[in-house]
Amino acid sequence: MKRTRLENTPCPAGRALDLIGDWWTLLIVRDAMRGISRFSEFQRSLGAAKNILSTRLKALVAEGILKVEPAADGSAYQDYVLTEKGLALQPVLVALGQWGSEYLFDEGEACTLLVDNKNRQPLRKIEIRAQDGRVLESQDITAIIPEV
């Protein structure tokens, strides 16, 4: 079955998933946030086939999520570096990871924990807040399409 493209939907989540919804793509962004920058490092970390990894990296560069720079160590390699647009995905990955650790691991099962570098304490759970600071639940939110 052919996948439906969502690039023209008025739903921001649909458009975002159209771009980054593939799990290899999000794992590449996750690894880039952890400091991985070379093709070989991504491949070693992810175990992705070279053609899949190459296709995903090219797409992330084309969409402005990653940029290609000369290797920081002066070698002939190139580094894939997150752009501002790519770095803006951090809350998405943190929220996804927090959801996964809460719902997809058994009690006592080893699970990666995100901690604050300064004090080594776990991150607080991401919350959705109103303009006035109130924490919002799903029933407190409505999606609208503003008139243009």
Q: Model-predicted segments: where are they?
A:
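Short, charged/polar surface micro-motifs in flexible loops or helix N-caps
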Residues: R34-I36, G86-L87, R120
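Basic, amphipathic "hinge/linker" alpha-helix immediately C-terminal to the N-terminal HTH DNA-binding motif
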Residues: G21, A72-L93
